[in-house]
Amino acid sequence: MTSFEDFHRLRAKHALHYARAILGSESAEDVCQEAWIKAWRAWGSADPAKLDSWMLAIVRNCCYERLRSNKATVTLEESDLSPVTSHEAVVVAALELAAAWVLLQRLSPPLREALWLREVMDLTYAEIADVQDVPVGTVMSRLHAARRKAARLLHKQVDR
């Protein structure tokens, strides 16, 4: 079995990006710390074959605990932008990122999560089902609905 330290080193950024996808704020770092502490405490009971989905499920649960406690805020951080060379490219990248973020925020949390896990984190349907604690068929339905709604929202933006 992988050591906890090795696993943390390999997956810390993935966990943080996932938390940011759910919370959309700097509180994602705090939530990730809570999640890693919970993971460390439960490390002995983790299934080595499912460590990634196990950790993402812990992150997800911590995020929803934070949302329930009404401590989450939505911000767009400068550090979320990719490095670019010109001022014009910075503006274009910021506008694209902001537009994508606004579109994602208009999806319900289960749809947004499923889409993020599939398209950004490249998880399989089975892994997403483990993380979201739902059947694979539900994951497929959520992804279909998320893509359909995202396309509809995008078409509305283009038509404006």
Describe the residue ranges of each PLM region.
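C-terminal flanking helix
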Residues: 12, 16, 36, 108, ...
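Short, small-hydrophobic-rich alpha-helical interface motif
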Residues: 15, 19, 28-39, 58, ...
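Short, aromatic/basic-enriched loop-to-helix "N-cap" motif that marks the start
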Residues: 43-58, 136
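A short pre-motif secondary-structure segment
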Residues: 114-118
